[in-house]
Amino acid sequence: MEVKEYKDGIYRGDYGITYFVLNEKILMKHLGTMYKTTKHFIFGEWAYPLTDDMKMEFDNIYNKVKQW
């Protein structure tokens, strides 16, 4: 099974889960907490692009959060 590639941006999933993708790194916000995850665990549809501020802070957040 081929794994889908995701373009940079924000994805909305079921149950209020939001995914943030930048340069193939993925953050998931679930119940108010951020986690690192992989493209195998994105269950959402592309909603809109990341803002410039989000892009600037992405790596800082990514490096601090736990793996899902």
Residue spans of the language-model regions?
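Acidic, low-complexity, intrinsically disordered interaction modules
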Residues: 11-59
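Short acidic DE-rich linear segments
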Residues: 67-68
